[in-house]
Amino acid sequence: MTKSIQAIRGMSDTLPEEIPYWSFLENACRSVVSAYHYREIRFPVVEQTALFKRTIGEATDIVEKEMYTFTDRNGDSLTLRPEGTAGCVRAGIQNGLFYNQIQRLWYLGPMFRHERPQKGRYRQFYQLGVETYGMAGAPIEAELIFMCLRLWKALGLESCIHLELNTLGTLDSRNAYRQALVTYLQSREKELDEDSRRRLHTNPLRILDSKNPDLQPLLAEAPKLIDYLDETSRRHFDQLRSLLDQAEVPFIVNPTLVRGLDYYTHTVFEWVTDQLGAQGTVCAGGRYDNLVELLGGKSTPAAGFAAGLERLVLLLRGVQECLDKIDIYVVIAGEAVIQEGLLMTEQLRNVLPEWVIEADLSGSSLKSQFKRADKSGAKWALVIGEEEIKTNTVTLKHLRETVPQKNLTRDTLISYLKSEG
């Protein structure tokens, strides 16, 4: 027997019963970002490897260990995108979107990282990315956070996701803090785990993001970045917190919050849940004013966020009822009337275009069809058999309430269904 081919580890199939949750989520994303007049942009899933090395940082875990990189037939080093911001900036520069312009952009699509797969973490994963360009200051950051909260409310998730904030300050203040942190960690280097000792010499701020419980007491005593902020950075962060307070958006300041990408400055934020274990971050973002210039464009203030759709779907399944709704399941009694049943179902769709109607064309027994009708979650079963064809009637059975079934003429069926909704 020929061995079957399996999906690549960490790259899962999305099956039909899961799609309604994805569709609900994607539609909510599009609705919310459109309400703020952000415009969609699409760019390739494959970019030159140099793009990510320059933006994400060569000393980051993503570039060092997680990127899917290959050499094409022309000898060029290419990479499947591990995140969307770098590609969005590249597209903006290449197509002149940032030249003396303000841009509000969004995208939705797959990203790729070679991480250890577990619940909420996959090697192919989907993100909603939202990016703003040309606007400095805290107000646009507040708008991004307001947008996130509006999305959680649209999804019914606002009670299980909370906001954490921090500031990385300007590059000057962050460099001063970096030196103080390195000095502190070097004095306690023997207490660090192997991964943190490696990061100490490459990307020391990432040690603050360690999930190792044995390191938490040591990190709690580490210097705090907020103590190294210059006056400009302090005013920026204070204004953002004031705006969130005025809008009654609850948040906590997390001094150990850093982002895994080197290009962030000033504000960083994460939306976190306690319902997904270790993969509790469902959305993260911040400000990255130096990124456009880093990629060869004109100095342009920028901010944005990315939300992980797989993790949001996991949360959705816990709070939303089945989203795969069927209004009518058409039971066709006997192979002799399948064609008539199919044509009548199509006529129903013409006059009830908003209704979801499924016709059973299997030719199987009534018992089997009613089992499928009940399992489908449909509100009504509409029975069409030889007797109904002869008398120009249908039998309508309510599947969710214990009420007598009705025998209706085809003319009265439509008005009855509309009245029952």
Swiss-Prot record:
Its main location: cytoplasm. It is found in: Cytoplasm. Its EC number is 6.1.1.21. It catalyses: tRNA(His) + L-histidine + ATP = L-histidyl-tRNA(His) + AMP + diphosphate + H(+). Transmembrane segments: none annotated. SUPFAM superfamilies: Class II aaRS ABD-related, Class II aaRS and biotin synthetases. It is an enzyme of class 6 (ligase). The gene is hisS. Homodimer. GO terms for biological process: histidyl-tRNA aminoacylation. Belongs to the class-II aminoacyl-tRNA synthetase family. It comes from Coxiella burnetii (strain CbuG_Q212) (Coxiella burnetii (strain Q212)). It holds the Pfam family tRNA-synt_His. The keyword RNA-binding does not apply. Keywords: Aminoacyl-tRNA synthetase, ATP-binding, Cytoplasm, Ligase, Nucleotide-binding, Protein biosynthesis. GO terms for cellular component: cytoplasm. InterPro entries: aa-tRNA-synth_II, aa-tRNA-synth_II/BPL/LPL, Anticodon-bd, Anticodon-bd_dom_sf, His-tRNA-ligase, HisRS-like_core, HisRS/HisZ, HisRS_anticodon. This is Histidine--tRNA ligase. One of its GO terms (molecular function) is histidine-tRNA ligase activity.
